[in-house]
A protein has these predicted regions:
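Positively charged n-region of N-terminal signal peptides that target proteins for export
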Residues: 1-6
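Extracellular ligand-binding/catalytic regions of CAZymes and related secreted enzymes
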Residues: 23-26, 41-42, 48-53, 62-86, ...
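Helical hinge/lid and interdomain linker segments adjacent to catalytic or ligand-binding clefts
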Residues: 27-31, 38-158
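Bacterial N-terminal signal peptides
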Residues: 8-19
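A glycine-rich, often tryptophan-bearing local segment used as a flexible ligand/cofactor-contacting loop or short
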Residues: 114, 123, 127-225
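Catalytic beta-strand/loop cores that center a nucleophilic Ser/Cys/Thr
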Residues: 51, 57, 105-106, 116-117, ...
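Structural detector of well-ordered beta-strand residues that form the stable sheet scaffold
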Residues: 147-149, 255, 285
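Active-site rim elements
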Residues: 33-36, 126, 152, 202-205, ...
Length: 349
């Protein structure tokens, strides 16, 4: 009996020694599988960041595979023979792509992850529109209080889906979509502009970005749980800076923004970088940070400690409405970037 008593006491002490909430990790679902960016490495890095905090358990749901055969390369202008061969090759490619799509139509329509098993979705998807069952389940999840965090090119998708456009407020859209959204530097609020307000018009009025570069993020709501303890200004590692995003500012709450410098092909305006919006009972956070392409060798945008902090805290807040995660050691300053592999970031208070 004494042995059993001691064993029970040791078990109790072990439980008391666990960090608060260690047995109740937030259940995260990452959606990926289609993207013009490197969705595989984005998911790997995102998953690593979230798991390194000790606050989350992460599952990945990958969309059915796309047609894998590469498109024929375009010939140089003026080569009539090469152009004729290219046209024939494209015709063949399009036929094969259509046949593949038709053969996998049922698989695509039936792709509906079990959203109810999770508390928050991290969206790393930018591809063809989902089937109706998937769209309905996704919408119902967020409407009923599930969290949603959209990363980088995720805001490029679903131009014609009204519910998604309401969730993200603004995204990468063409010049005829909604209003051009910027940030008023004096108030820190999102504002809708007309074409006449645009300072640089040489690149048109649709969404775009200039050259990748290091740029400063400016905190616009220091009191919000996601932003508490984050410097008023800090330097983000090399990334794309989206400009001229379009949509509606009606229910958009900006958390941070960046000035888009003309010398890097920017807009000469302050652009939203992190923002949130309610969607019925759900909380939706969107960030345009986090660029990586298949040909890129640098993880700077994803491994920036500032980005990792925003990602993890946004995910926690979207899921629970609260933030317990601290600002980790090595957070960037106004003068210096900070790029650290997710497994080496120190999240301890």
């Amino acid at each position: 009996m004494k042995t059993l008593h001691k064993l029970g006491l040791l078990c109790l002490l072990a439980l008391l020694a666990l960090p608060l909430g260690a047995a109740e990790k937030i259940r995260v679902l990452i959606l990926d599988g289609r993207n013009n960016h490197d969705w595989v490495r984005t998911t790997e890095s995102t998953k690593a960041t979230l798991e390194a905090t000790g606050r989350f358990t992460v599952t990945v749901a990958t969309a059915p595979a796309a047609f894998a055969k590469a498109k024929p390369a375009k010939p140089k202008p003026g080569d009539a023979v090469a152009k004729k061969a290219f046209d024939a090759a494209m015709k063949e490619w399009n036929a094969e792509d259509a046949a593949f799509t038709q053969a996998h139509a049922a698989e695509w329509e039936q792709w509906v992850p079990k959203f109810a098993d999770h508390q928050v979705i991290v969206n790393n998807y930018n591809g063809p529109e989902w089937g109706n069952a998937m769209k309905d389940a996704f919408t119902e999840f967020v409407m009923n209080g599930g969290g949603l965090v959209n990363v980088h090119a995720a805001n490029n998708a679903f131009t014609g889906w009204d519910n998604f456009n309401e969730m993200i407020c603004c995204g990468w859209r063409n010049a005829t979509f909604g209003k051009r959204i910027a940030v008023d530097d004096k108030t820190g609020k999102a504002v809708a502009l007309v074409d006449a307000d645009e300072k640089i018009t040489t690149k048109g009025f649709g969404s775009g970005h200039g050259a990748k570069h290091v740029f400063t993020l400016k905190t616009r709501d220091a009191a919000h749980p996601i932003m508490q303890g984050i410097p008023a200004e800090w330097l983000h590692a090399t990334d794309e800076l989206y400009g001229r995003m379009r949509g509606s500012a009606d229910h958009m709450h900006v958390l941070s923004s960046s000035y888009s410098k003309p010398e890097f092909g920017g807009t000469d305006m302050h652009e939203p970088m992190v923002w949130f919006a309610p969607f019925n009972k759900g909380r939706v956070v969107t960030t345009s940070m986090g660029h990586i392409m298949a040909a890129d060798t640098s993880y700077d945008a994803l491994h920036c400690v500032g980005f990792q902090t925003i990602l993890a805290r946004s995910t926690e807040w979207a899921a629970t409405g609260k933030v317990t995660l601290p600002v980790p050691e090595g957070f960037p300053t106004l003068d210096k970037t900070s790029v650290i592999e997710p497994s080496k970031v120190n999240w301890k208070k």
